Amino acid sequence: MAKEAFDRSLPHVNIGTIGHVDHGKTTLTAAITKVLADKGGAEFKDYANIDNAPEERERGITINTSHVEYKTENRHYAHVDCPGHADYVKNMITGAAQMDGGILVVAATDGPMPQTREHILLSRQVGVPKIVVFLNKCDMVDDEEMIDLVEMEVRDLLSAYDFDGDGAPVIRGSALGALNGEAKWVAAIEELMAAVDEYIPTPTRDSDKTFLMPVEDVFTITGRGTVATGRVERGTIKVNEEVEIVGLVEEAKKTVVTGLEMFRKLLDFAEAGDNVGALLRGVDRESIERGQVLAKPGTIKPHTKLQASVYALTTEEGGRQKPFFNKYRPQFYFRTTDVTGEVILPAGTDMVMPGDNVEMTVELIKPIAVEDGTKFSIREGGRTIGAGTVISVQ
């Protein structure tokens, strides 16, 4: 069957359902596809179809994730739903499912629970900009005041983690009721999607951001100079533009891109996603290496000390058999290179067990081009034992 062309006429947004186990995330995902399918904007996916999430591998970690897509009048959405709590933690920290916004599902029968809080914290750490709330199972609560209390609790919780608790849309509904076609609850799903359309900002496309390309390989063309190859991570680069070589050394070095080529063809410019070779003026083979990045001057700096949110793999996932402690020195893999670093655990945390999610300080032995939101893996003897996201650089 021929593949359908991807429709670029609508802005594309990545969202996901988050919240405590059994509060109705997957049922809500199914309900959204059903309500939008009736308007011609989706293909209906039932609960079993979404819950039976395929395994994916990201940074050497197996994650179960379901992806569904649907359209509203204004946007095209890719929606992720994870069956288990650990899958959310891994998904968000590895960036396997980049989220431009979240739908926080809270059962009105229960109110906020431990994973509700944990998912909000994770969303804050990995930089999810906005959260819309869906109070589910409202058909099972007779007392309106009870729902008011739950809403207040959720708003307070969002505010506690620096989200807009006062301004966030909170929709009351029943995902199961909507799946069963009850008009009142179908209307709640329509209200939810209108809120998502309006409240969650359209993300800046990768190609509109500032230029950055991790260096994967370096070689010399006799008579022409040094070429750095890699995949453009974001932004665009034109021939004769100035770039900086950043990382592994304290001082960034400026140079000019005098030529670009892809698949042996010359280019005037390259953009996010392109695998290119960049010819660099006045740079000798020894002064650039894999693990550095080419970037728009002044946009990224090399750092050795950072705060990070880290997930330690379980033994079954190929992680460590035993916990690690303060001053642990593994390899930290950023973009294209491994650098040794030392782990400094927060006060009160003596050790990190396989399967734990922890905030820590990392001190690298060499400076690396990193910024808030940069993803990395933690490796030991060539195998991945953890994944992390930079929360802040120091």
From Swiss-Prot:
Residues 174-176 are annotated as: G5. One of its GO terms (cellular component) is cytosol. Its EC number is 3.6.5.3. GTP binds at residues 19-26, 81-85, 136-139. It comes from the Bacteria. Residues 19-26 are annotated as: G1. Residues 136-139 are annotated as: G4. Mg(2+) binds at residue 26. Residues 60-64 are annotated as: G2. It is found in: Cytoplasm. Its main location: cytoplasm. The keyword Hydrolase applies. Keywords: Cytoplasm, Elongation factor, GTP-binding, Hydrolase, Magnesium, Metal-binding, Nucleotide-binding, Protein biosynthesis. InterPro entries: EF-Tu_GTP-bd, EF-Tu_GTPase, EFTu-like_2, EFTU_2, G_TR_CS, P-loop_NTPase, Small_GTP-bd, T_Tr_GTP-bd_dom. This is Elongation factor Tu. The lineage of its organism: Bacteria, Bacillati, Mycoplasmatota, Mollicutes, Entomoplasmatales. The gene is tuf.
